[in-house]
Regions:
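Residues at the starts of beta-strands that form the adenosine-phosphate
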Residues: 45-49, 86-87, 147
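N-terminal catalytic cores of NTP/NDP-binding nucleotidyl/phosphoryl-transfer enzymes
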Residues: 9-72
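Phosphate/ribose-recognition catalytic cores of enzymes acting on nucleotide-derived substrates
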Residues: 195-307
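Glycine-rich, Lys/Arg-enriched anion-binding loops that position phosphate/diphosphate groups
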Residues: 141-240
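N-terminal Rossmann-like or analogous alpha/beta NTP/dinucleotide-binding catalytic cores
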Residues: 59-144
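Residue-level signal for inorganic ion chemistry
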Residues: 27, 80, 118, 178, ...
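N-terminal, positively charged, Ser/Thr/Ala/Gly-biased leader segments
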Residues: 3-9
Length: 307
């Protein structure tokens, strides 16, 4: 997949279809858009692509309001490539871009010589203040070479799928529901860093400590059944996120004990899939009581992971 920083970098002598959206999480609803992009591109003999944005526009419009994200930019690009997109325009929104009127944005799209199709979700908005709606795309391009298709919101068990709904699930620890909306367990990619070594030296459970960006959505503190993707292989695991109150830590950590794994992975890239919440964070009177609880947690995690 070719990643481009602006609309002006798109090919001028080759036709393309663009799906437009922020696409945080690339969830099942977004995947409907990607599928429609590919269908329309095939009809038009064009390349399938997307127009997306990073970081979230709210980071520019209201820096004090924190919008936690489901994906890093690298994870988003990897997901778009996996969905079969050949092109990805990733605009970094600034005050100038966000001040554009809906009419100006439409005019910029219309001046793209290779554009032959646009696909968006029904709740898509654009232009200053979000005044432009998906229906405006249809009306603007209805007598042009550009075919516009609007994709209805997808539902799961009667609930509309959206990035906001998925964030709410994760923040509530409802990892199974988040997975139903995403189409897979929620994942976080980061680097393995050195921790306090209590898991190895005190408790007898060596853990991998995951460093993640501050703008990621994290589940509430507690213990989770997880899967760890390390060096191209996936392993069942158990993860604790929290402040380790038994030891009086102030800093939040994400520590993962990988079952039947004894390799050194410090500094390696690591992807963690959050499968199910086992329990909330607890403070124990002694390390021995914590170890006893960890054994119970591991068994529950293995049962949940079917290992």
């Amino acid at each position: 997949m070719t990643i481009l920083p602006t609309l002006h970098d798109l090919p001028k002598d080759q036709p393309f279809v663009l799906g437009i959206g922020f696409f945080d999480g690339c969830h099942l609803g977004h995947q409907e858009v990607f599928s429609e992009v590919k269908r329309l591109a095939k009809e038009k003999g064009a390349q399938p692509g997307v127009l997306t944005f990073y970081p979230h526009p709210m980071k520019v419009l209201a820096p004090d309001i924190h919008v936690p994200l489901l994906q890093s930019i690298d994870e988003k690009m990897d997901a778009l490539a996996a969905q079969g997109m050949a092109l990805a325009v990733c605009i970094r929104p600034d005050e100038t871009f966000l001040a554009k009127s809906a009419e100006d944005f439409l005019g910029e799209l219309a001046r793209l010589p290779g554009l032959v199709g646009l696909v968006t979700g029904e709740n898509f908005s654009f232009g200053h203040g979000g005044l432009g709606k998906s229906g405006d795309l249809v009306r603007f391009f209805e007598e042009s070479r550009v075919t516009v298709r609007i994709v209805s919101l997808r539902e799961n068990a009667g609930k509309k799928i959206s990035s906001t709904a998925i964030r709410q699930c994760i923040l509530a620890g409802e990892m199974e529901q988040a997975a139903r909306f995403l189409g897979h367990p929620y994942t976080i990619r980061g680097d393995i860093v050195h921790g306090f070594r209590r898991g190895h030296d005190v408790l007898g459970f060596p853990t991998a400590n995951l460093a993640v960006s501050e703008d990621r959505v994290l589940p509430p503190d507690g213990v989770y059944a997880t899967r760890a993707l390390v060096k191209g292989h996936t392993f069942p695991a158990i993860t604790n996120i929290g402040n380790n109150p038994t030891f009086g830590n102030a800093k939040k950590t994400i520590e993962t004990f990988i079952f039947d794994f004894d390799e050194s992975i410090y500094g390696a890239s690591f992807t963690l899939a959050w499968v199910a919440r086992i329990r909330g964070e607890m403070k124990f009177a002694s390390p021995d009581l914590l170890v006893a609880q960890i054994h119970q947690d591991i068994q529950k995690a293995k049962n949940r992971l079917h290992v």
